[in-house]
Amino acid sequence: MDSRRSLLVLALIFISFLVYQQWQLDKNPPVQTEQTTSITATSDVPASSPSNSQAIADSQTRGRIITLENDVFRLKIDTLGGDVISSELLKYDAELDSKTPFELLKDTKEHIYIAQSGLIGKNGIDTRSGRAQYQIEGDNFKLAEGQESLSVPLLFEKDGVTYQKIFVLKRGSYDLGVDYKIDNQSGQAIEVEPYGQLKHSIVESSGNVAMPTYTGGAYSSSETNYKKYSFADMQDNNLSIDTKAGWVAVLQHYFVSAWIPNQDVNNQLYTITDSKNNVASIGYRGPVVTIPAGSQETITSSLWTGPKLQNQMATVANNLDLTVDYGWAWFIAKPLFWLLTFIQGIVSNWGLAIICVTIVVKAILYPLTKAQYTSMAKMRILQPKMQEMRERFGDDRQRMSQEMMKLYKEEKVNPLGGCLPILLQMPIFIALYWTFLEAVELRHAPFFGWIQDLSAQDPYYILPILMGISMFLLQKMSPTPVTDPTQQKVMNFMPLIFMVFFLWFPSGLVLYWLVSNLITIAQQQLIYRGLEKKGLHSRKK
C-alpha cells in the first residue's frame, strides 16, 4: 500500500472515529436498572422503604453558612442539613489566568450542584417536615500551617439523642470525611439510615464533535467497576442497585464529585429525577443502623470533590480512578500518560514532553516504518508484472489472485506491509486524544508563545495550518502509482481536509501530529537513501 493510499485509509479511520464519537454523544441508550426503584420522582432524599417515603421539603429556608478550608479547596456548608453547597478548587483557575478559583459545587438561581447527606429512616432527622438545624460556634475553619487534618463537628440534639456531623479535612487532599457520631441517651433504641447524594441541574453534555465532554452521573458497584449513567438515563429509568462496595459520582469534564459510603456494608445506589425543577440526584442509601439506649454509634462516609487525579482517587476508593475515562484505548493511554508525566517532571513543560513522547513513539515504530517503505518500493517495482497479469488473466480473478500471491511469495513482498504502521498509529493518536480530554494535568498547561493551554484549540490556528502543510509535503515527497484522476484529486485534498478537522482539536494533539509528520519526513529521506543503494528507489518520478 503506497503512502497516499495509506493516508486515505488513515482519513477514513479518523472520520469514522469522529462519527462514532458524535453518535456516542447524541445517542447514549439508557441502562436497565437491576430492580424497580422505590424512590419517588419528587423526593429530595431516598425513601427509607416503599411504605415510608420520606423527603426533604424543597421550600425550606437556608441555614447559616460556614466555611471550611484546607490547602486545596474551600467549602461552604449549610448548617441546615449540613450540605456542601460550594467547593472552590484553590489550585485551579476558573478560566485561563483568571486568578479566580474554579467552583465545582455551587448553588445559584441558574444552576444547582450540591452534595447532600443526612439520616433518614424510622428515627431519621431529615424528613419531609424538616431537616436538622445544626449548631456550631464560629463561621470560618481553616487547616493551619503544620496541621495535617482538621475536624469540624456540627451539633444537633433531639429527644435525648445527640447527633454530631463531623467534617474531616486533610492536607493536600480533596477527600472530605463526612461522619456521624450518634449518642443515644433517650431511654429507647433508635433506627436511622444514612444517605448521601449529588444534586445537579439536568444539562446536556457540552463540547463539539472534535472535543466532546461528558456531564452526568456515574457509579461503581460490586458487579460493575465503572458505569456512566447520564441525566437522560435517569429520566428514563431511576437507578436502584444493591451493592456492598461502590460509589456514586457526577462527572464534569476534568472534575468529579463522588460519595463513597462505608464499603463494608450493603448500600443502595439510586437516582431521583425532578422534571418540574429540571434537577436530578444520584446517591446512596445505607442500611438501617440501630443504636440501643445508652449507646453510641459512628457512621462513616467520604466525599471527593475536586479534579480527576488518578493516583489520589485510586487510594480513596476502588475504581474511582476509572472516572478518568480513556475509552477502549485505556491500555495505551495509561502508559502514554505515565510517560508524559515522567518526561514533564524532567523538562517542566508539557509541550516539550509531548514532543519527547512523539520522538519515543516514532523511534519505536521506526522498524515498521522502514518495512512499510521497503514494501511499497518493492510493490512499485512489481507494478509492470502485476499489470501484465491483469491483462493475461482478464476476468479470471481467482487465477489472477493465485498468481499474484505466488509473485508476492517469490519476491518476498507483503502487500499489507504498508498498512501496519498506520493501523498502529491510529490507536496511539486516539489514546492521546482521550488523554487530552480527560487528564486535568493538561488543563491550562502552557507550551510557549501563543499556546497557553495545550488542552484547548489553537486560538490563531497556526499549529493546524503547519500540520496541514507538513501533510502536504509528506504526500508530495511520497511516490505513488495512483493514476485514476478522481482518486488523485481526493488525495490532493486530504491535507486540507485534515487541517480543517484539526482546527478544533486540542493544540497539544495537533502538536503531536505536526511533530510526527516532521519526523516521518526525516525518516522517509533516511530510508529512501538506503533503498536507492539497493536499487529499490529513485528520487526521479
Curated annotation (Swiss-Prot):
Description of how the protein assembles with itself and partners: Interacts with the Sec translocase complex via SecD. Specifically interacts with transmembrane segments of nascent integral membrane proteins during membrane integration.
InterPro entries (UniProt xref): Membr_insert_YidC, Membr_insert_YidC_N, YidC/ALB3/OXA1/COX18, YidC/Oxa/ALB_C, YidC_ALB_C, YidC_periplasmic_sf
Function: Required for the insertion and/or proper folding and/or complex formation of integral membrane proteins into the membrane. Involved in integration of membrane proteins that insert both dependently and independently of the Sec translocase complex, as well as at least some lipoproteins. Aids folding of multispanning membrane proteins.
Designated name of the protein: Membrane protein insertase YidC
UniProt membrane topology term: Multi-pass membrane protein
Compartments in which it is found: Cell inner membrane
UniProt-listed NCBIfam families: PRK01318.1-1, PRK01318.1-3, PRK01318.1-4, yidC_nterm, yidC_oxa1_cterm
Family, as annotated: Belongs to the OXA1/ALB3/YidC family. Type 1 subfamily.
Pfam families for this protein: 60KD_IMP, YidC_periplas
Spans annotated as Disordered: 34-56
Any GO BP: protein transport
Keywords: Cell inner membrane, Cell membrane, Chaperone, Membrane, Protein transport, Transmembrane, Transmembrane helix, Transport
GO CC, one annotated term: plasma membrane
One MF annotation (Gene Ontology) recorded for this entry: membrane insertase activity
Organism: Haemophilus influenzae (strain PittEE)
Transmembrane segments: 6-26, 337-357, 416-436, 454-474, 495-515
Coiled coil location: none
